[in-house]
Amino acid sequence: MSLVRRSNVFDPFSLDLWDPFDSVFRSVVPATSDNDTAAFANARIDWKETPESHVFKADLPGVKKEEVKVEVEEGNVLVISGQRSKEKEDKNDKWHRVERSSGQFMRRFRLPENAKVDQVKAGMENGVLTVTVPKAEVKKPEVKAIEISG
């Protein structure tokens, strides 16, 4: 399956739709910007399990490692949060389109019982955050051979 980004001006599905209630809704709801919502929604995170660990990967383009927090809360809950800062604007700038998001994001994951939460490691490279949570070794049941008399 391939995904094709639509960028054709003549394609009605690639254009932003006008919403007559948009301005009414914005005047009633307190000031939260679309960018704040988009930043929260754009914190995409993959979680895979290997035989040794649970690995989380988050695409955080444009976010510095100082702007990201990785924590483990009570109850084996991994929390990845941060903030994507806005660029400084010059009053003479004229924006034609703003698609990159800024604002805060937070994601929570309940870790399984076998997670070693005291040994979590995190690293960031090229805008990708990798969090590794080691798993406790599963004790193999000890088998004791019983001699049969008789």
Curated annotation (Swiss-Prot):
Domain (sHSP) spans: 36-150
Q: Which UniProt keywords apply?
A: Cytoplasm, Stress response
Keyword Cytoplasm applies = yes
Instruction: List the PROSITE patterns.
Output: SHSP
Tell me the compartments it is located in.
Cytoplasm
- Its GO CC terms? cytoplasm
Top-level taxon of the source organism: Eukaryota
Recorded hits in CDD domains, A to Z, give:
ACD_ScHsp26_like
Tissue and organ distribution:
Expressed in roots, stems, leaves, spikelets and embryos.
Which GO-annotated molecular functions does the record name?
Answer: unfolded protein binding
Task: Provide a GO biological process annotation.
Answer: response to heat
**UniProt keyword Cytoplasm, yes or no:** yes
Q: InterPro entries per the record?
A: A-crystallin/Hsp20_dom (IPR002068), HSP20-like_chaperone (IPR008978), Small_HSP (IPR031107)
Expression induction or repression: By heat shock.
Quaternary structure? May form oligomeric structures.
- Which protein family is named in the record? Belongs to the small heat shock protein (HSP20) family.
Q: What is this protein called?
A: 16.9 kDa class I heat shock protein 2
Instruction: Report which gene this protein is encoded by.
Output: HSP16.9B
